[in-house]
């Protein structure tokens, strides 16, 4: 193997510079140069620029006698030179310029030395990318937020620090703190007695969150107990007590970015739970009844990453069994880590989720450590722009018997989407949370809560609309409480199938009973619905409207009528019919009021009351009694009917392609039921938004209309419902099938989106429903679902660009600019790779799982269940729908534009810094232009000094600082190298200097795109220093993760240009860069942290190329260590150029 020397003189660079500014002259004879040119031209015409005796540069063609002599001499020298480095063939840093005969030399040099150049293709690509990027950002900011209707809470907070929770209880006492909340003027307490009287609740703040965020929830708990619960003796006897809110101050730690921090917080939570429970054993600190058991468990409420910390605590070794049985999380990313830049956070998430899945996969409850735990995940919806609400889903972790996911827009009397922070203080939301907690508390039990099944029923009642298929009806569990006696002249019995319409109430004195006969059983698809603007009375209440489900009460059944709580009997006739009735208010569903003046579902107006039962739920009843109890005439209405599913349910048989091309239009007939449901199975993706319009074909403001149309948009998993009052035009977006989400534990049929429309059936008019895809609004959905793509895909672009630069350099000796390399990649490898990735995305989405019988390892799994691959959606787009294959080239296009923009921003910064550097460097007075081509571009310290600096940095990485800090230092050093290289290239205008400047700049751009992967962990480390927590990370001290970067950057500080590789080993560089590009596209979103290690391997390969050139040996290494080898100094004959 032969290594080509870099022997071109600095005069050749001057000749090249003059060639860039003058036209080429014809070749002519001249004297032989003092030193032969050691490069053999391979293709085209090679121009040998040498100074003659007069000092003038003269171009010489290959056909001249001088060239033939040089070529022969050089070939002879190469043939007798023994191979020194068998691994790679190293070529010189400075070469004769090779160009095709028809290419102007001036253009070639201009392209070589102008990093600002931009081809038409690159310009058009950038403009198109900017248009798409602007449209996406504008759509996200303008169309994805919605209105803000949260009420402002009132509170008087006091935080008591638990000073007793010190280093005797936890090793984190100096970093974290535990507090108790007391509402000033409401909660009795003093320094000796904390006033602990109820069930303990522990609040966990989120990433960089404050413990003070709990004050709105805790204040509502104190006030609601003092104003309502404390005066309800029945609830007090049932075990309801106050809620003692504790909270942890995590010192605004950032658990979302660092897995070890997450584990530390979980460990502290378990220690805090043990300490809280111990407080209730001390009678001096509590005001509890002596006959009540001491608490053995704590309710956990976590916001954002605090919810993940709560789940993690149950997997830790210091967790006390059954010390936690209820967890409520708000905007917590359960399904997937919010960012994948840290390996620890990705691995920790996997371990936590695997533990929960394994626990709930157990057949027997005794084998499930989480059997008594209920987990409720609450998401804010599209207003949350910090954590994608799709990640709040727990369907892949917990079965429906132990938890569910719900959105705030679903919760009764809340009906509003909230952002990431307002979910902790929104007035409507906090009241629903606190009321549900008071319902599940039972201090008569050591667990302080009701049994798991009862807790789940209560949470469904408070958090779900009641219209879901999983909602339970309590009517069948109740006993008859009202005896109704029928009289012919005071009661109305409607015919079978007739609709009851009450337009006013209170026209008769005394209760007016309206009876609807229940259809006979066996009629499929029958449903009872009732809607009214009045609140439904419970038994014994003196309101205006009561709904009863009745069965005939026999005259002689041995049961006295006195056992009923209420006896509606206005007749003394012994032959009158009597009905034993159950009150239906227990199943009352609140719907937002929809009138002609309504604007939003969350308006502060009295909600509508709604009842809905399937015919099977009414099997033991014969009549539905609607009792008008108003004593005086009053405004109020009610509509009740039995309807057929064939009339009330419309299933749209249309695909996504049909929606995109023509949309969907449904006309509801005039004789429709009050409730009509339009179900569209094709609508399941969270990446598409829609426009829906409801048009009523009757005169606006019709006085006969009892209420304006009310629309509910819903999906079953997760439980997301949105209500639209006085509906006309609606922007529809949903959180259905989302990218990168793991599959659910139990596969269910995909029913898509359901639209339920309540309209006044008495208006006798048709209604048109039109649905179309909203392309502009859909662009905004890409931000939250694919925001990490914009950190991964640019690495693909940069890798392919650098790959093209190295290919050209190894072939020609010119290291082209980043802009030229990007343009070349756009014309060659990049479109092919994006096309291949598009085909891969389509195939991944359409691939199906092999049947169990075809699986060679089927014997190792449960024969009755197919194992679920929870990582199958981690690749590429993470989409289960092949329709979105076009997102790959779209993201590629946008990232090309982003890389071009960043390139020019970096060039501007370098230009400014190089000017500053030039002004500072002008004090030295001269610029040295070395005569030997392989000397450094600019002076550098001795090898021994460089090795000492690298050694110190590596020792610090292995002991005190994370390698991410060393990477940041390397980026800064590389930036300084680029500044110096660019200034020297402009001053000397030599090809070698331009080569090195382009090479150093491209490496800097590559490192710059890897920097975001490391910067988040670095922020965690810096935060720990700020809070005086100096314990080093147990991870991120792997020296091998940073050593190649340090050596490469330190080597480049000497100005050494990387040698050319002309053997087959040049393909190693190409393959490594291509692998980085492919990995960035396929795994870059889900496992971004590995990109750092891949680029680290590339840096190691580049370092090895340097070593092969310098003839690395142990002997020379020891000479450097001992200080015997010093850097080369310029010869006395060096050309010196005086600075202006």
From Swiss-Prot:
Q: Mind listing the UniProt keywords for this protein, alphabetically?
A: Endoplasmic reticulum, Glycoprotein, Hydrolase, Membrane, Protein transport, Transmembrane, Transmembrane helix, Transport
Which residue intervals make up region (Disordered)? 1-84
Q: How does it sit in the membrane?
A: Multi-pass membrane protein
Q: Does the keyword Repressor apply?
A: no
Which Pfam family is an annotated match for this chain, by its short name? Answer: PGAP1_2nd
Reported EC number(s) for this entry are 3.1.-.-
Residues annotated as glycosylated are 63, 862
* UniProt feature, compositional bias: Polar residues: 55-78
Per the record, GO CC terms?
Answer: endoplasmic reticulum; endoplasmic reticulum membrane
Q: Where in the cell is it found?
A: Endoplasmic reticulum membrane
What is its EC class? hydrolase
Per the record, the similarity remark reads: Belongs to the GPI inositol-deacylase family.
Q: What is this protein called?
A: GPI inositol-deacylase
């Amino acid at each position: 193997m032969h290594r080509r020397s870099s022997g071109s003189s600095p005069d050749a660079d001057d000749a090249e510079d003059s060639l860039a500014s003058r036209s080429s002259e014809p070749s002519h004879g001249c004297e032989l140069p003092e030193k032969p040119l050691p490069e053999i031209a391979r293709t085209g015409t090679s121009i040998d620029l040498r100074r003659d005796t007069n000092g003038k540069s003269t171009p010489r063609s290959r056909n001249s006698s001088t060239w033939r002599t040089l070529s022969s001499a050089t070939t002879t020298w190469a043939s007798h030179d023994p191979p020194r480095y068998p691994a790679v063939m190293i070529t010189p840093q400075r070469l004769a310029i090779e160009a095709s005969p028809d290419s102007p030399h001036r253009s070639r040099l201009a392209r070589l030395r102008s990093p600002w150049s931009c081809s038409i293709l690159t310009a058009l690509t950038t403009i198109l990318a900017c248009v798409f990027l602007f449209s996406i950002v504008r759509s996200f900011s303008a169309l994805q937020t919605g209105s803000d209707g949260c009420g402002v809470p009132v509170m008087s907070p006091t935080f008591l620090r638990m000073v007793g929770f010190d280093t005797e209880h936890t090793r984190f006492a100096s970093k974290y703190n535990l507090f108790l909340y007391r509402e000033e003027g409401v909660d009795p307490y003093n320094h000796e007695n904390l006033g602990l009287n109820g069930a303990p609740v522990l609040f966990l703040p989120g990433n960089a969150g404050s413990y003070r965020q709990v004050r709105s929830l805790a204040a509502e708990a104190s006030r609601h107990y003092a104003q309502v619960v404390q005066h309800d003796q029945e609830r007090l006897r049932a075990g309801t007590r106050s809620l003692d809110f504790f909270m942890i101050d995590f010192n605004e730690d950032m658990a979302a970015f660092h897995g070890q921090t997450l584990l530390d917080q979980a460990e502290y939570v378990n220690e805090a739970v043990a300490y809280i429970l111990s407080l209730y054993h001390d009678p001096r600190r509590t005001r509890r009844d002596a006959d009540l058991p001491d608490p053995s468990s704590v309710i956990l409420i976590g916001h954002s990453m605090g919810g993940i910390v709560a789940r993690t605590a149950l997997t830790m070794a210091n967790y006390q069994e059954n010390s936690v049985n209820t967890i409520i999380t708000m905007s917590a990313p359960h399904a997937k880590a919010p960012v994948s830049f840290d390996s620890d956070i990705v691995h920790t998430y996997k371990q936590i989720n695997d533990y929960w899945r394994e626990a709930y996969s157990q057949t027997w409850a005794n084998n499930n450590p989480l059997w008594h735990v209920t987990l409720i995940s609450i998401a804010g919806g599209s207003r949350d722009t910090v954590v994608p609400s799709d990640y709040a889903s727990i369907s892949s972790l917990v079965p429906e018997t132990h938890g569910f996911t719900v959105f705030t827009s679903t919760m009764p009397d809340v009906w509003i989407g909230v952002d990431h922070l307002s979910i902790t203080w929104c007035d409507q939301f906090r009241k629903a949370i606190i009321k549900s907690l008071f319902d599940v508390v039972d201090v008569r039990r050591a667990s302080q809560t009701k049994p798991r099944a009862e807790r789940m029923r209560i949470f469904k009642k408070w958090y779900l609309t009641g219209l879901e298929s999983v909602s339970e009806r309590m009517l069948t569990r109740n006993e008859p409480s009202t005896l109704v006696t029928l009289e012919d002249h005071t009661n109305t019995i409607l015919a079978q199938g007739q609709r009851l319409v009450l337009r006013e109430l209170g026209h008769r004195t005394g209760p007016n009973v309206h009876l609807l006969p229940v259809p006979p059983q066996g009629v499929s698809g029958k449903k009872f619905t009732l809607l009214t603007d009045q609140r439904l009375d419970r038994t014994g209440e003196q309101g205006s409207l009561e709904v009863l489900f009745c069965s005939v009460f026999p005259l002689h059944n041995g049961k006295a009528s006195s056992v009923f709580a209420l006896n509606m009997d206005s007749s003394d006739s012994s032959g009158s019919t009597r009905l034993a009735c159950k009150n239906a208010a227990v199943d009352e569903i609140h719907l937002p009021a929809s009138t002609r003046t309504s604007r939003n579902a969350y308006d502060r107006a009295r909600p509508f009351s709604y009842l809905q039962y399937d015919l099977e739920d009414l099997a033991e009843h014969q009549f539905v009694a609607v009792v008008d109890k108003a004593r005086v005439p009053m405004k109020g209405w009610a509509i009740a009917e039995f309807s057929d599913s064939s009339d009330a349910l419309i299933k749209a048989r249309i695909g996504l392609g049909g929606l995109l091309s023509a949309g969907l239009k449904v006309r509801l007939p005039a004789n429709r039921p009050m409730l009509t449901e339009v179900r569209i199975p094709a609508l399941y993706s969270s990446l598409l938004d829609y426009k829906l319009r409801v048009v009523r074909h009757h005169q606006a403001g019709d006085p006969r209309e009892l209420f304006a149309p009310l629309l509910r948009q819903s999906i079953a998993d997760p439980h997301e419902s949105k209500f639209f009052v006085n509906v006309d035009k609606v922007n529809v977006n949903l959180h259905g099938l989302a990218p990168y989400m793991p599959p659910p534990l139990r596969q269910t049929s995909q029913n898509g989106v359901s639209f339920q429309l309540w309209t006044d059936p008495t208006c006798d008019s048709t209604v048109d429903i039109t649905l179309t895809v909203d392309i502009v609004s859909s662009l905004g959905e890409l931000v939250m679902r694919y925001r990490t793509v914009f950190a991964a895909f640019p690495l693909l672009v940069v890798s392919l660009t650098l790959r093209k630069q190295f290919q050209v350099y190894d072939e020609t000796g010119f290291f082209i600019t980043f802009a030229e390399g990007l343009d070349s990649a756009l014309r060659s490898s990049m479109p092919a790779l994006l096309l291949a990735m598009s085909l891969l995305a389509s195939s991944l989405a359409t691939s199906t799982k092999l049947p169990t019988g075809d699986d060679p390892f089927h014997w190792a799994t449960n024969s009755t269940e197919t194992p679920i691959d929870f990582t199958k959606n981690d690749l590429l787009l993470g989409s289960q729908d092949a329709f979105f294959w076009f997102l790959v080239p779209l993201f590629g296009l946008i990232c090309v534009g982003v890389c071009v923009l960043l390139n020019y921003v970096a060039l501007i910064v370098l230009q400014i810094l190089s000017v500053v550097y030039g002004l500072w460097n002008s004090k030295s007075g001269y610029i040295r232009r070395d005569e030997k081509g392989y000397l450094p571009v600019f002076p550098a310290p001795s090898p021994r000094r460089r090795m000492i600096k690298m050694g110190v940095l590596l020792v610090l990485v292995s002991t005190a600082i994370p390698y991410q800090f060393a990477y940041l230092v390397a980026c800064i050093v590389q930036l300084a190298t680029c500044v110096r290289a660019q200034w020297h290239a402009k001053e000397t205008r030599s090809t070698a200097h331009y080569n090195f400047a382009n090479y150093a700049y491209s490496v800097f751009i590559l490192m710059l795109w890897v920097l975001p992967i490391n910067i988040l962990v670095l922020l965690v480390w810096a935060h720990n220093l700020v809070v005086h927590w100096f314990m080093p990370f147990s991870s991120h001290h792997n020296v091998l993760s940073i050593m190649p970067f340090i050596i490469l950057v330190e080597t480049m500080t000497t100005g050494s240009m990387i040698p050319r590789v002309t053997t087959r080993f040049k393909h190693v560089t190409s393959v490594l860069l291509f692998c980085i590009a492919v990995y960035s596209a396929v795994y870059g979103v889900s496992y971004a942290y590995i990109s750092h290690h891949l680029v680290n391997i590339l840096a190691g390969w580049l370092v090895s190329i340097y070593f092969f050139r310098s003839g690395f040996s142990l002997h020379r290494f020891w000479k450097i260590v001992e200080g015997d080898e010093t850097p080369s100094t310029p010869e006395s004959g060096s050309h010196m150029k005086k600075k202006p």
